[in-house]
């Protein structure tokens, strides 16, 4: 006998299962309809509860009493009356801080300085930096302006 094995020695087969058959029972009838019966009973009880609360609240309002707090949900009653907000609140008038925008063009308050016209023979303006015009991307040198890395 090998004491290290976890299976029992009686009825061992080659696949490690014992010779007895285990039947797993499934409570299918309960899961098929029993749970739905409980759910339907709970939903019916909630509907009945809300209906009774609505009847009680309607009777209380007919007698002039206040309804049960947080239960004024009966659908056949009219919604509460809405009161209009007072026009001037805190005795102040509201002023629009910005004037309305118009669609007409308005020139800036001061004219910008005039720029001298380009020469008529040249199509393009002169370069902003003369050094940039002297070199191009094709003449890029390896360490121009860059630190040597590694």
UniProtKB/Swiss-Prot annotation:
Q: Could you state one GO cellular component term attached to this entry?
A: Golgi apparatus
- Show the ranges annotated as biased composition (Low complexity): 1-19
> Which parts of the sequence are annotated with region: Disordered?
1-21, 85-131
Which InterPro entries is this protein grouped with?
Answer: Chitin_synth_reg_RCR
> Which GO biological-process labels does this protein carry?
endocytosis; vesicle-mediated transport
Task: Please state what the protein is called.
Answer: Uncharacterized protein C19C7.05
Q: Which PANTHER family does this entry report, sorted A to Z?
A: PROTEIN RCR1-RELATED
GO MF, any single term: protein-membrane adaptor activity
- Residue ranges under compositional bias (Pro residues)? 106-115
């Amino acid at each position: 006998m090998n004491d290290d094995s976890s299976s029992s020695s009686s009825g061992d087969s080659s696949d490690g299962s014992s010779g007895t058959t285990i039947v797993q029972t499934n409570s299918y009838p309960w899961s098929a309809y029993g749970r739905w019966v409980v759910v339907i009973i709970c939903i019916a009880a909630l509907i009945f509860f809300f209906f009774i609360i609505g009847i009680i609240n309607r009777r209380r309002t007919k007698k002039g009493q206040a309804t049960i707090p947080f239960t004024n949900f009966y659908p056949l009653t009219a919604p509460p009356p809405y009161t209009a907000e007072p026009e001037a609140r805190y005795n102040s008038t509201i002023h629009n801080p910005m004037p309305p925008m118009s669609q007409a063009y308005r020139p800036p308050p001061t004219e910008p300085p005039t720029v001298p016209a380009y020469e008529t023979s040249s199509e393009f303006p002169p370069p902003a930096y003369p050094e940039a015009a002297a070199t191009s991307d094709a003449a890029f040198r390896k360490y121009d302006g860059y630190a040597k890395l590694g």
